[in-house]
A protein has these predicted regions:
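Compositionally biased amphipathic helical and low-complexity segments enriched in hydrophobic
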Residues: 7-15, 43, 179
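Active-site-proximal helix-loop elements at catalytic-domain edges
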Residues: 24-38
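Short, positively charged and aromatic/hydrophobic N-terminal segments
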Residues: 10, 15-28
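Charged/polar low-complexity intrinsically disordered segments
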Residues: 3-6, 21
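NTP-dependent nucleotidyl-transfer catalytic core
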Residues: 36-37, 43-77, 81-413
Length: 413
């Protein structure tokens, strides 16, 4: 382990010089590409600096030196044995304080650099670069979409939401730092029958003044109460309220928009504390009018099949269960909305990569969605990446907002 750590540290130090050259705001004549330095010093008749540069490697053992040049490939050109070539080059290598030692060993020329000089150059480079240290322009002209946090409307942040939020925000900042145009997307969970339940609960037990005062936690209390006390009649009312939302009913949508406004006011306060930002809050509802064309395309391309009344894409040939596109009642599902979202994002942002920072339990879901897009002829499906992570659970099992079994994030931060 110690040996591997030494190698990693050595590799990082030795490559600092070359790496820092691609930093947009940092230039220093002191920063050196040691491989280039060695190859230019050794270039001779019959051996170009380019050939030497491409041959230089890191020795397997740090005790052998920091760089090694195998001389075997030069034997034919120079008409000498590798050992003689290495010895001759070692004797002629200039001692100027950059390279501490050049030693010929069994046909190899091993170099040990001056660590004191390297340390000074590295520190000078870090100080000169300041906050830009480690940045680059490698992503210039490329866009990376990152779907993370993706909160549910009317549900407070619990500790489990921190993983996707922190990982996604870190990736967002890293990609920006590397010169990419990062697009942070908060794919709001603002679609589903639960909002019919919430409106029903509010109609039965809610008070506007109390909800305004209690904010998102007051809304969540209503949702929890519905799930523990709702009668069959209330369940039917909830389904009807959701239908009203979908059909554009003014009162139902005004209530929903109010819940959404309270939610965003709350979550943006959390994001501010965490120093997390987003460029888009386009949630599931945003894609309502964009799912129809996706379903039509699937049907036109012969990918859509009926199974027990539902519309599916058969993925059995690819080792996966079918991807459900429409339920038997014609309602859309997560996959339908994610297909529409991916197509919209490609059209809008022309991304180089699109990352989904979502728990590992959704591995199958994303494999299915990516495969369906591939079958639809979207060659960019290969640029979709599921960044999976483990779920956070309590001692007595998984958290559940519906059951009120959670640890709120604001109580932790």
């Amino acid at each position: 382990i110690f040996k591997n750590s030494q190698n990693a540290l050595r590799l990082n130090l030795l490559n600092f010089a070359a790496y820092v050259k691609i930093m947009p705001d940092y230039k220093s004549e002191k920063v050196m590409d040691y491989k280039k330095y060695i190859s230019e010093k050794l270039a001779a008749e019959g051996i170009s600096a380019e050939e030497i540069y491409s041959s230089i490697a890191l020795p397997p053992d740090p005790s052998m030196g920091d760089y090694a040049l195998p001389c075997f490939k030069f034997a034919k050109v120079l008409r000498k044995s590798p050992a003689v070539i290495a010895q001759t080059l070692a004797q002629s290598f200039p001692a100027d304080g950059v390279i501490e030692r050049a030693e010929a060993v069994n046909g190899y020329l091993n170099f040990t650099i001056n660590k004191g000089a390297l340390a000074r150059e590295t520190i000078d480079g870090v100080l000169a670069a300041g906050e830009r240290y480690g940045s680059s322009a490698e992503g210039a002209g490329r866009t990376v979409c990152i779907d993370y946090s993706s909160v549910n409307i009317a549900k407070p942040f619990h500790i489990g939401h921190l993983s996707t939020t922190a990982i996604g925000s870190a990736l967002y900042k890293i990609f920006n730092f590397l010169g990419y145009k990062a697009v942070g997307i908060n794919h709001l969970g603002d679609y589903g029958t639960q909002f019919g339940k919430l409106i029903c609960a509010y109609k039965h037990w809610g008070d506007r003044e109390e909800v305004e005062k209690g904010g998102i936690h007051a809304i969540n209390d209503l949702y929890v109460r519905f799930n523990s006390e709702a009668t069959e009649q209330m369940e039917q009312e909830a389904r009807e309220y959701f239908r009203l939302i979908e059909s554009g009913d003014r009162e139902a949508n005004e209530l929903f928009d109010w819940f959404k406004e309270l939610t965003l006011e709350y979550v943006k306060g959390i994001y501010e504390k965490l120093n997390v930002t987003f460029d888009s809050y386009a949630g599931e509802r945003f894609y309502t009018d964009k799912m129809g064309p996706v379903v039509d395309e699937l049907r036109e391309k012969g990918l859509l099949k009926e199974s027990e009344g539902a519309q599916i894409v058969d993925l059995e040939p690819y080792g996966m269960p079918p991807c459900l596109i429409l339920r038997s009642d014609g309602a859309s599902l997560y996959a339908t909305r994610d297909l529409a979202a991916a197509i919209y994002r490609k059209k809008t942002y022309d991304f180089y990569k699109c990352l989904y920072v979502v728990a590992y339990q959704q591995n199958l879901h994303f494999r299915q969605v990516f495969k369906v897009l591939e079958l639809m002829g979207r060659e960019w499906a290969k640029d979709l990446v599921h960044v999976a992570y483990g779920m956070v659970s309590l001692e007595d099992g998984a958290m559940s907002t519906r059951k009120g079994k959670v640890v709120w994030l604001e109580d932790v931060i």
